[in-house]
Amino acid sequence: MYFPMELKHNPTGKDDIDAEREHREEILGELAESMNESTESPEGDEEKFNSEPSAELEALLPYYSQVEDEALKVAKKYFHGTFIANSQNVNGQKLFEYAHNGHTYRCYVDIYNENEREINIIEVKATTISKYIYKEINKGGKKERKGLYFTDAHGGNPYSLIIKDGNIWRFNTADSKVNDYALEKFEEKKKYLLDKYRKEGKHPYDLAFQRFVIEGALRKAGDKRPVNYYLAVLNSEYVCDGAVDENGKRVYNNVDGQEIITFIELNETTKAYQETILKEIAILESYISTPHDVSKKVDVGEYCAWGEKTECRFWRHCFQTLRGVPDTNRANNYVYCKGSFNEGKIENKYQLVNEGYWTFDDVPMDWLVKENHKIQRDCYDNGAEHVDKEKIQYWFDQLEYPIYHFDFEGFPCPLPRFKGERPYAQSVFEFSLHIEREPGICDKEKDNFIFLNEECYDDERKALAKAIIDHFEFNEDGTLKGTMLAQFTTYEKGRLEELANLYPEYSKKLLAIRDKSADLLHLLRNNKEMYEEMYKKEYENKYGKPYEDIIMEMPNDIKKKMKAEMKKAGEIINYYHKDLGGSYSIKKTLPVLVPSLTYKGMDVGNGVQAYIAYINYDSDEPTFNTLKTKAKRRDALKRYCQQDTWAMVEILKAVRRKIK
């Protein structure tokens, strides 16, 4: 977007139109969003990209260009005629200009295709088809429905909103006619694509603006050919077969009917968006022609992504009152705050801000009805430290020694790098392991093992998998001797499963590690299933019978009280300190619990920097201005990954001291 200097409100300070720069910044933003979507980490973790352009994102631009190149290759299989595309320079793309009310609107088309009968506009995005289609996943032993779908009754049969026709996804009009209920829900879900603030509606909105410009330009040119609009996205169902060309370069063949790129037809959606586009253009033009009050209060919402890594770059304008508020005192630091304040009248953290409750202590005490919020507020107001010794001790009691403090580093490459990988698969290249054989007995160097790929472009996953099982100990029955510990075990367990599927000879032991794990988040934050089970065991030990039998024998009022207490045990946080700021990422907990240990000043200081250093192994350009050689990059990666597992060792020591 272009903001001329003469305008009163020019937040970006731009004074010229630079299409290449604009396009580059747009791509960087898309990359940040797509990479963050692919990152399996708890909400608020720092292992994500900022929305601002950065050296880390710049290093990933070649991968985005590859996505555009692959999209063109696949498009040529399914569309006929001539093509105009250029992944390296936006000025080589098809340009449309449309003059409207004295203003000129421009758009470049990623892939322009035309023939005598029609024009096809293809907008390439580095995201995947996953968010748009129905899928069923297994979560904690329960099936969970994801994506865009509708049903034929309340809780009835699910149908995907869009279905595949060849390699093009279109609205599922056939199943919408099953009955009136299905048709109603089908129309409701279609509207998700018309909400630019939803993850499903953002990209259709971009394409709809292009439609406004393109069709305006074509009308003036007298071109009456029909125009079709498509998103080209990565196919999350595609599994790389490992094929390469004669030069050893990866080739993405059609594998079992799946292409690496798939298309979503959005003619109906982009047409329905035009009313919104015209209204917003009228507002934009009024801002240009008429001075307006830029200090006027603007309501904030989910679209601001406030406090997240991808927060809007203009938040300092809309959140002017928050400029001087320290992170630890932001109102959004209350955990699980949806519908939690003022008897549910305050829906979320954005409504808090819109109504003038900007800081932690702005929120009235009588609004705090949830126990967690009362704990947080007490810690903030009084400098207290919350430690639930009983629950923390229960967590320690579940551990079997030795403890394997374990951490993977992976690269979520947009295009799969090796056989068996999908788009944005976490391609693991390093792990660190600290072995704690008895409580508190672990040496940072002697009890540590690190595996790090020798090369970036070689598939070393088999050697990595073997190194894992060689450094864990197993019982005669094949089970793990001890407990694998990680921060957010979902990530480590997922990678172990993937390696087990790739290498059957190592499968049994890799899955044995997965099946005996503990999570540092469950120690410090909470875990519903674990601590509800703790509550049940206390009653079973007291009465000598199963919990279900005990509760059946209780009067209704006692039964109700017991259920409430069990729910409370599963929800209340185990540990809190005001400096956590509502986050339990290791970058927050470490300074609080082990202030002598820090990531500050490290050449590689987070997971993003880790894989950027890895993919730049052989680059002649300095990485982060200090890592000028491959040897230095490898050394920095080893020290960073070692720090992750050593931090877990030290955190356990610190927590043990607090419950003595």
Regions found by a protein language model. Name each.
Residues 482-490:
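Acidic beta-strand-to-loop metal/phosphate-binding motif
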Residues 367, 610-660:
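Long, compositionally biased intrinsically disordered regions
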Residues 133, 240-244, 414-419, 492-502:
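A short acidic (Asp/Glu
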Residues 68, 72-79, 121-123, 128, ...:
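Conserved RNase H-like, two-metal-ion catalytic cores of nucleic-acid enzymes
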Residues 1-121, 127-167, 331-385, 631:
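Metal-dependent nuclease catalytic cores that hydrolyze phosphodiester bonds in DNA/RNA
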Residues 89-97, 402-412, 519:
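Two-metal-ion RNase H-like nuclease active-site motif
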Residues 13-43, 245-401, 414-416:
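Cys/His-rich finger/ribbon microdomains and the adjacent scaffold used
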Residues 152-204, 213-314, 322, 453-479, ...:
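Metal-dependent nuclease catalytic regions and adjoining charged, substrate-binding loops involved
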